[in-house]
Regions:
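Conserved donor-binding/catalytic core segment of Leloir-type glycosyltransferases
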Residues: 9, 217-218, 222-239, 245-248, ...
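Aromatic "clamp/platform" in nucleotide-sugar-dependent glycosyltransferases that forms part
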Residues: 323
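Short hydrophobic beta-strand element within catalytic cores of glycosyltransferases
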Residues: 340-344, 360-361
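A conserved catalytic-core segment of Leloir-type glycosyltransferases
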Residues: 2-4, 30-33, 39-108, 280, ...
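Nucleotide-activated donor-binding/catalytic signature segment of Leloir-type glycosyltransferases, i.e.
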Residues: 223, 268-310
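Donor nucleotide-sugar binding/catalytic pocket of nucleotide-sugar-dependent glycosyltransferases
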Residues: 147, 160-215
């Protein structure tokens, strides 16, 4: 068998700085370095056009998909029209998936979360049917599952969810990013999985701050003497950003809390609540997703667009008070960019990450006086912060580097394809 294969990544969106898109980039980078060729199917893609196959209906934010989800979730019955439209969209997407496989002569699919969480049910059904009909070797890379999300618990789509999220098919090989996901997948479906955690390129240190990244503060109206607290997540309730606002208030120092991402697919009500709370507590809150991209560039209105790296380099402290995380990309990013972090010790962190020895300012259900005291100490003592972040970086290099991902992917491809 040819040792180099053509691989197709499939997701609802492969663009921007969300966790799935970022991890896809890392997998693609490693697989390309190993000599394989990678191609991309999604509702939105910022990969080169020659390697992308874009079908708008594959995006979870497509109007038809949003309309379907409105009838499928928070209800126990769906309309016949919804069922008919799902079937029509499934066929439409399956036709394009067949063409994607044919036109790029693919030998392996890697499905990024589109067989894990039912944000686009027609796409999941189309993928499951394609795989069942072709027996095409497939990796289901599961970042989080539908049963982990509150909004998918009341459903008129349980028949679809059981069939495709995830599908139990002989040629689908399941990869999860945490041990809890592996146990739940086995308990609920009886199938085994491979655990491959998220990673960062710890063997290549982050770039040093430069004049471009120094423009972050003036561009966002943040004073040079303000402490910049970075909340590097989407604006969704499970991120508990209200606790980051509370921390900023209780530090009793000049602070700006910057939120890096948008709300994504979960509406704007939570953002409105956060703005109101910040006003009540007299905390400066900046939502900066409109000036953050994957690469440095310029917006149509002339504003500079910054990378996440630029934002991290200007941050004094990272806040991460989530109740639930599939793994914790923001945690790894904070470690990589050598920033101290105040965070809730969510379940996956306690099970999979904390035992490795990382040093964080941790709390459980609420921010305590001790949490505030430790955060103040870190902000006021650069030497203490430097020692904490140096220690964490070395652990990150040991456990979550690209080398670890490369070894895991080599073994996985050998098991699936014998290469």
């Amino acid at each position: 068998m040819d040792q180099h294969i053509r691989i197709g990544f499939v997701s609802t969106r492969l663009a921007g700085t969300d966790g799935v898109s970022l991890e896809t980039r890392k997998w693609s980078h490693i697989l390309t370095d190993l000599g394989h060729e990678c191609f991309y199917f999604a509702g939105e893609s910022d990969w080169p056009e020659a390697r992308s196959y874009v079908v708008p209906e594959a995006h979870f934010n497509h109007p038809e998909i949003r309309a379907l989800n409105a009838d499928l979730f928070d209800h126990y019955a769906r309309s016949p029209q919804t069922s008919q439209r799902i079937q029509a969209l499934q066929l439409h997407l399956k036709t394009h998936l067949y063409e994607f496989v044919r036109s790029f002569d693919l030998g392996l699919l890697i499905v990024e979360n589109a067989l894990s969480i039912p944000m686009n049910i027609p796409l999941g059904l189309a993928l499951a049917e394609l795989i069942a009909e072709t027996h095409l070797p497939t990796i289901g890379h599961h970042h989080d599952f539908g049963w982990e999300r509150k909004r998918f618990k009341v459903t008129a789509a349980s028949d679809y969810q059981l069939g495709a999220f995830p599908p139990i098919l002989h040629s689908v090989h399941h990869v999860v990013i945490n041990s809890y996901g592996a146990r739940q997948l086995a308990l609920r479906t009886g199938v085994s999985s491979v655990l491959i955690p998220n990673v960062m390129d710890f063997d290549t240190p982050p770039p040093e701050p430069d004049a471009y990244s120094a423009a972050v503060r003036p561009a966002l109206g943040i004073a040079p003497d303000d402490y910049l607290l970075l909340q590097p997540t989407r604006v969704v309730p499970r991120k508990r950003i209200e606790q980051a606002i509370e921390l900023a208030r209780r530090l009793n120092s000049k602070c700006t809390l910057l939120v890096s991402h948008s709300s994504g697919d979960e509406g704007t009500a939570y953002e409105t609540y956060l703005r109101t709370l910040a006003d009540l507590l007299d905390v400066r809150l900046v939502f900066a997703s409109d000036v953050i991209g994957y690469e440095r560039s310029q917006a149509p209105d002339g504003r500079k667009l910054f990378t996440l790296a630029d934002i991290y380099q200007q941050a004094d402290l990272v806040t991460y008070p989530s109740t639930v995380e599939g793994f914790g990309n923001a945690f790894l990013e904070a470690i990589y960019y050598r920033r101290p972090i105040v965070m809730s010790t969510y379940e996956i962190f306690r099970r999979d990450i904390e035992p490795k020895g990382f040093r964080v300012i941790g709390f459980e259900d609420f921010i305590t006086e001790e949490t505030v005291r430790q955060a103040q100490a870190i902000l006021r003592d650069p030497a203490l912060a430097a020692e904490m972040t140096r220690h964490n970086y070395e652990l990150g290099r040991r456990y979550y580097s690209y080398r670890i991902l490369e070894k895991s992917l080599v073994v996985l491809l050998n098991q699936i394809l014998g290469i």
